[in-house]
């Protein structure tokens, strides 16, 4: 079965997946549980199923599970129409994915990837509830984009089998996965995780367990500074995004990108950086805080720095 899809950027050209059979055998991982059926969870399920693994997806909200199923089917159908995968590939992969609102469906997985909201308390509770349901050898991973892997691992009964796997959004299209060891992570766990990620057709960037790791340590302060630039009246939403697209050759402006990521996620990462590094340069912009308080979280709520309720996005400031 073909391995996970490799793409250059959102809307970019997709490459044909490569075979991952040998890597799957070496990793001893055959089945994968995914907790969280949101944007990240369904994207991870998508690439993992295409790579030949059995997938069990869990979310506490049945509507999230139903939406994830529809999203995965729609995105795979789009790949078929573009010639990235065949119709047989799609139907075979879809049959590998099971959906359930019951956490016990995850219990027999060889690897469980947590992809819940970027809230440490929520993630810790998930792992506390999950561990008694798992078989002894199951490896645990978190898709956190900023939270300490060591702290998350500490609430489990297997910190040596715990690792950070930070996939980029959207998962089927983005090449990179950050791989993060906690202080207790064993070498075998790291090796198994590395082989697994490579079997998806992804490229690994290894990061130490510092707040926000590599990508978001660099990216989110830039986005936060763009919000400050808007907050202070230096430029409008349109002018800020245009300046960075055309002046720095970025594929998306920072405010457009913030809406795509989710303003709540942006705020969570900035709070982790601010609290973890104790440096005022990471203080979240008050305007970002206000937007999140208002429920303007970006594309997923149809309002953020742009209003998405019409035919095309309109800047809100």
Regions found by a protein language model. Give the residues of each.
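Rossmann-fold dinucleotide-binding core
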Residues: 139-208, 213-217
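NAD(P)-dependent Rossmann-like dehydrogenase/reductase catalytic/cofactor-binding core
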Residues: 6, 13-25, 188-191, 198-209, ...
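Rossmann-like dinucleotide-binding cores of NAD(P)H-dependent redox enzymes
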Residues: 57-91, 179-190, 204, 211-219
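Rossmann-like NAD(P)-binding element
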Residues: 78-139, 147
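Hydrophobic packing residues within well-ordered alpha-helices of enzyme cores
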Residues: 68, 130, 152-153
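NAD(P)+-binding Rossmann beta1-loop-alpha1 motif at the extreme N-terminus of oxidoreductases
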Residues: 4, 13-75, 82, 133
């Amino acid at each position: 079965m073909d391995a996970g899809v490799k793409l250059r950027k959102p809307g970019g050209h997709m490459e044909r997946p490569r075979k991952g059979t040998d890597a799957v055998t070496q990793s001893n991982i055959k089945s994968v549980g995914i907790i969280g059926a949101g944007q990240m969870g369904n994207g991870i399920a998508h690439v993992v199923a295409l790579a030949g693994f059995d997938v069990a997806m869990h979310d506490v909200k049945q509507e999230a599970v139903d939406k994830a199923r529809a999203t995965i089917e729609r995105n795979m159908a789009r790949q078929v129409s573009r010639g990235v995968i065949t119709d047989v590939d799609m139907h075979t992969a879809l049959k590998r994915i099971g959906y359930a609102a019951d956490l016990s469906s995850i219990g027999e997985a060889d690897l469980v990837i947590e992809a819940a909201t970027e809230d440490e308390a929520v993630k810790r509770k998930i792992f506390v509830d999950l561990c008694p349901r798992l078989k002894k050898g199951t490896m645990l991973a978190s898709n956190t984009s900023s939270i300490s892997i060591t702290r998350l691992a500490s609430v489990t009964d297997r910190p040596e089998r715990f690792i950070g796997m930070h996939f980029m959004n959207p998962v089927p299209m983005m090449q990179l996965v950050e791989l993060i060891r906690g202080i207790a992570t064993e070498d075998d766990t790291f090796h198994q995780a590395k082989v697994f990620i490579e079997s998806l057709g992804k490229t690994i960037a290894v990061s130490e367990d510092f707040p926000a790791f590599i990508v978001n340590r660099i990216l989110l302060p830039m986005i936060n500074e763009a919000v400050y630039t808007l907050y202070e009246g230096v430029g409008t939403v349109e002018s800020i995004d245009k300046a960075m697209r055309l002046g720095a050759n970025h594929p998306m402006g920072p405010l457009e990108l913030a809406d795509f990521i989710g303003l709540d996620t942006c705020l969570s990462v900035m709070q982790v950086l601010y609290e973890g590094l104790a440096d005022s340069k990471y203080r979240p912009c008050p305007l970002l805080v206000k937007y999140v308080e208002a429920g303007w979280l970006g594309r997923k709520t149809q309002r953020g720095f742009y209003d998405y309720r019409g035919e095309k996005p309109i800047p809100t400031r």
